[in-house]
Amino acid sequence: MAKNINQPVAYPIFTFRWLAIHGLAIPTVFFLGGITAMQFIQR
């Protein structure tokens, strides 16, 4: 990534946005993966 001039130099990577994205994305992918798997595991 190019250096962002608008943001301070010591901009942390692990921010609330990072926690929100991963905190929601990981369970969502697991949930969608479970639903997708159930579509193929029919009796």
Curated annotation (Swiss-Prot):
Cofactor(s) recorded in Swiss-Prot or TrEMBL: heme b
Superkingdom field: Eukaryota
Coiled-coil regions listed: none
Subcellular location: Plastid, Chloroplast thylakoid membrane
Name assigned to this protein: Cytochrome b559 subunit beta
Pfam families from the UniProt entry: Cytochrom_B559
Residues that span the membrane, as ranges: 18-34
PROSITE patterns found in the cross-reference section: CYTOCHROME_B559
Residues where heme binds: 22
InterPro entries found in the cross-reference section: PSII_cyt_b559_bsu (IPR006241), PSII_cyt_b559_CS (IPR006216), PSII_cyt_b559_N (IPR013081)
Cofactor mode of binding and number, as noted: With its partner (PsbE) binds heme. PSII binds additional chlorophylls, carotenoids and specific lipids.
Function: This b-type cytochrome is tightly associated with the reaction center of photosystem II (PSII). PSII is a light-driven water:plastoquinone oxidoreductase that uses light energy to abstract electrons from H(2)O, generating O(2) and a proton gradient subsequently used for ATP formation. It consists of a core antenna complex that captures photons, and an electron transfer chain that converts photonic excitation into a charge separation.
UniProt keyword annotations, A-Z: Chloroplast, Electron transport, Heme, Iron, Membrane, Metal-binding, Photosynthesis, Photosystem II, Plastid, Thylakoid, Transmembrane, Transmembrane helix, Transport
GO biological processes: photosynthetic electron transport chain
An example Gene Ontology molecular-function term: heme binding
Family: Belongs to the PsbE/PsbF family.
Record's GO cellular component terms: chloroplast thylakoid membrane; photosystem II reaction center
Complex formation: Heterodimer of an alpha subunit and a beta subunit. PSII is composed of 1 copy each of membrane proteins PsbA, PsbB, PsbC, PsbD, PsbE, PsbF, PsbH, PsbI, PsbJ, PsbK, PsbL, PsbM, PsbT, PsbX, PsbY, PsbZ, Psb30/Ycf12, at least 3 peripheral proteins of the oxygen-evolving complex and a large number of cofactors. It forms dimeric complexes.
DNA-binding listed as a keyword: no
